[in-house]
Amino acid sequence: MHYRNIPKTLLFLLLCCPSMGLTGCSTTAQGDTGSFSPADYVNPFIGASTSTSAAGVYHGLGKTFPGATTPYGMVQVSPNTITGGDNSPGYSYEHTTIEGFAFTQMSGVGWFGDLGNLLVMPTTGPLQKIAGREDGSIGGYRSHYDKATETARAGYYSALLTDYGIRAESSATPHCGILRFTFPEGEQSRIQIDLARRVGGTAERQYIEVVDKHTIAGWMKCTPATGGWGNGEGQADYTVYFYAQVDKPMENYGFWRADIPDDWVRKRDEVVSVPYLQRVAAAPVVTGIDRIEGRHIGFYTEFGTRQDEQVILRAGISFVDMEGARKNFEAEIAGKAFDQVAREARELWNRELAVSYTHLTLPTT
């Protein structure tokens, strides 16, 4: 077959559309525009698997993520179901639990992955400091989720975390992300963040500070010594800086910091090993301070919630410095409602995909 005049951006549409997107596209190409919206044809679940058993092959898996992002966006707010293994996007459709929502993801790449930084999870009940394992052999704060409620579309993701009765939703701007959590009634609801978490390894060192009763900021330094791209062979060396706000006051917050020995390997499989998880699970909770730095740290803010009360976390990201993260936050997402962010993300996709659509030429032979 021969194709003419199909720009690169259309490849995304073809990959993400049901039935390759050709049915909907050809209808409008004949002049019947109707209420056509290109974003309606995007299916982020296409390719969202790392399962060799489901695919029947070892190579050629999709390894995409279903979470929210914008065209060419630096931020991808997506569910993560697994940390170790051959798992570049952090998510695989057949997994039955979610361990959190990260703000950076790789998509469609081979080899062992990277990113998956700033892992945020809403929880209730007693605090747990590890996600545990997807196979259930080690428990933690990860939650089963209802596949029937899992929804993904251009610039938006949602799922019901059934272990907690919490609905989680995500959307994004080019340099920021937003999470909306709808909680059940309870006195021990929380948002917790694993700053060490990284797909295929861990951040080598992390830092977080409480700026005020709504704001946190910090960074995660990731190097080849602690895994990541190609389990360290890819020589990925980067720092993710963040500036985040929670709309519910942080009046009861704390940190945990695990004492990781100097001689411990902290790569792809080691960070989900029994000794490593036990060490993190035993980390002491620290309160009464406003900042902490270490090799494996976490943060939580705890509060009471009414039935169906919504709590929002917004975060700006930078790969340059903390000031850049703050500026991105203030320029793109400060004070914006979740629905506004999701609507604007969808509009960005419609605008980008419409450009590709107008240049679409179907196969000539």
Protein language model features and the residues they cover:
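C-terminal motif of bacterial Sec signal peptides marking the signal peptidase cleavage site
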Residues: 23-24
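Accessory carbohydrate-recognition regions in carbohydrate-active enzymes
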Residues: 31-360
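Cysteine-centered motifs
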Residues: 16-17
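A short, hydrophobic C-terminal helix/tail in secreted or cell-surface proteins
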Residues: 361-365
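Bacterial N-terminal signal peptides that target proteins for export
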Residues: 2-11
